[in-house]
């Protein structure tokens, strides 16, 4: 059976400090805020669309009533 010898090291292997950690966290936070803002815009757009449909229904009903009165009188 053979053995593999490794050279002795004078220092412990260290990992370089993560200098971009704060930048990465800021980018992640910005991405989350961007997604949240997009969801908010979508919700507002949907609400606006519902209000527009409701308003259109009122206008169409008013037109029908007006046409009925004009036809009958």
Curated annotation (Swiss-Prot):
Residues 16-27 have a biased composition (Basic and acidic residues). Keywords: Transport, Viral movement protein. GO terms for biological process: transport of virus in host, cell to cell. The keyword Lipid metabolism does not apply. It is found in: Host cell wall. One of its GO terms (cellular component) is host cell wall. Belongs to the carmovirus/necrovirus/panicovirus movement protein p8 family. This is Probable movement protein p8. It comes from Panicum mosaic virus (strain United States/Kansas 109S). The lineage of its organism: Viruses, Riboviria, Orthornavirae, Kitrinoviricota, Tolucaviricetes.
């Amino acid at each position: 059976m053979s053995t593999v010898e490794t050279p002795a090291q004078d220092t412990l292997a260290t990992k370089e400090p993560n200098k971009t950690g704060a930048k990465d966290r800021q980018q992640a936070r910005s991405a989350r805020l961007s997604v949240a803002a997009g969801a908010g815009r979508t919700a507002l757009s949907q609400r606006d669309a519902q209000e527009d449909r409701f308003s259109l229904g009122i206008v169409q009903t008013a037109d029908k009533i007006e046409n009925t009165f004009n036809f009958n009188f």
